[in-house]
Each structure stands twice: as structure tokens, then as C-alpha cells.
Amino acid sequence: MEDGTVYRGFGFGAEDSGNVTGAGEIVFNTAITGYQEVLTDPSYRGQIVTMTAPEIGNVGINPVDFESARPWCAGFVVRELSPVVSNWRASGSLHELLAAHGVAGITGIDTRAVTRRIRLSGAQRAVITRKVDDPAGAVARARNHPSLEGRDLVREVTTAATYGWDEPVWEGPRAPSRGPVEVPALRHNVVAYDYGIKRGILRRLRSSGCRVTVVPAATPAREVLAIKPDGVFLSNGPGDPAAVGYAVEAAREICAAKLPVFGICLGHQILGLALGGKTYKLKFGHHGANHPVMDLGTRKVEITSQNHGFAVDVDSMAGKAVLSHVSLNDKTVEGMRHGELPVFSVQYHPEASPGPNDANYLFDRFCASMEERRRR
């Protein structure tokens, strides 16, 4: 780690083709399950993920639970890698997945100590290397690795071309007597900006009755408006929101067109910037599936899945948007809405994947705003 701390463990996943197998900002994730979804979430681009759960890998890997086509994180740190894969859905092991995609893993690490260091000292750059005889060199490489601040990582994960999402909704195993899963009527035409979009979001939009067209992150607003969508979705993604000015400008123009807009995670931050606010880097971010958030309208508490290292500055949004949700851990902004336009966003992940489904209602709210606009 860049502060000089060195942890020694056992490598798995990618073989070292040089001095360093993985380099990035090290974060910790408090989810007990869902490591496959975490690994394949494009929002983790440029980060080394430490799982706080003590044993990882016991349910293996299956193709259905991928949130994208591949793992995106720079490295993976666990306390104990399970030597056994035991799940009827598994088609491979965690080690095989990381090895196939060149992602470095390390096991045998005191992840409680790593988590505590990050929590107290803040986010740090780190490397995973098999060159164990040169710890000072590894620390130097960590310090020389670029920070996430100011980096546009969206261009590295976004789709290269526009496409329609038509994957059937997966509802888990069903008894034969219940028949196939019914796909709802597709009543709403939605354009989704891909800043690193998760498949769980696309599935949830489709299950809400949305016909989804996914566009690259740098698509100008005029091209989106030419499609004549009923609403626009701003997705999750990696990196610094202040570094994606093209996305902020497009969001600003789309809001001016008075279309319903729904943003999640990076999309929430981009929307905040588009409305005239500011963002800042958190000390160590929110990563996990157990974060309590209060809906300020209903005063109800939701347990949410989160994955972000930046946040919207609440003071900068005064007079520009209404605060709708707040973190009960650190009081940071977790949701906002425009006072007059059908525009709203949340910092957390209502689709979960992995995590609780307390906030699924937000997709229904998005559909309701499109329905209301159609009736006018």
C-alpha cells in the first residue's frame, strides 16, 4: 500500500507477467454474498477490492449472475479462498474466472486489518505483486499509480455501439406447474446511457415494462432526443464524475428537454453536476450491501447496496434540487429530485445485484413519471 504497509499472502487468479499483477485504489466491500456481481461491476474499474467476509468462492461462478461480460477490478483480496465449489448453478471457480481475465487475487490476508487501515487512513493506492523480494519497490509503484481523482474511466467501460436490451427477465427456478416467467408489456421507450451499466439495472428496467436502448457514454443529447424516448436513464460507472464533462453536458440538455430522467450512482453524480452542483471524493467510499438510507419523504429506512467513492456536495445543491435520501452512516447525499422537472436520482443501487431490494419502488416511480408525461 502507498503508506508503506505490506501484507503477504498466497496468489491466485492471474499469473504475474511482470513485476506487478494488479494496481489501483484499494477499497473494502462489506457484502457477505455476491462476490461475482462485485467482480463484474464496471464501477470497480481501477480498484482493488477487499472482501470483509471471511471465506469467498464457495459457490463458484455461473454465467447468469454476471453484471457485465467480464471482471473489471484491478485486483481481489480475500481472507480465505474456498478450496471447494459447492453450488448447483456453478460452472467454474473464482480462481478460474480471475485467471481467464488476467485479474490478480491474493488470499491469506488479514482483511480486518486492511479494512481498518483504509477506514482510518482513507483510500490508498496499492499493488498486488508476486515479486515478494522487493517490498520497497512495490510500495513505490503504488505511490506512482494514478489516483482516481480526475480520471475518466467511463470511456474504458462503456459500450462501443448502441444496442437494444432484450434479455429475458430471470426470476430464478420456478415449479413446472407455474409455467414460464411472464414478460410485462413494454410500455415505455427508455434510452439508457452506459457509463458502466450493470445488467441487473437493465433487467430491472425491462421487468418494469421498459423497452431499453443502450447508448455509449459520449452520445450527444441531440442523438438521444432524436430517438424520441419516453425517459432517459443515467447509469452507474467508475471514476471521477467531474472528469466526464461530455456526460454532464448531455444530461443538462436532456433535463432542459423536460424528459423524465432517473440516475443511479455515477448517473446521480453526473445529474448533480448538470444541475449546477459539485462533487467530492469520500474518505474511503461506500461499498457493500448493508448501508442504511433514510427516505426523507416517508421517514422510512432502506437497507441498500452501494458502490461509490465520490458524492454530491449537499451545500452545492441548495436551490437547485431537493434532498430526498440521506445516508444514516455519514449523512451524505443519497438521493435528490428536481423541484419542477420529472428528474430524480439516487446514489445507491436500488436494483441491488447483490443486496436487498428495499428500493425497487424507484423503478416504478420512474415508469410513473413517464406515464404521467404521456397523459399530458
Where are the predicted features?
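Short acidic-glycine loop/turn motifs at beta-strand connectors
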Residues: 2-3, 121, 296-298, 339-340
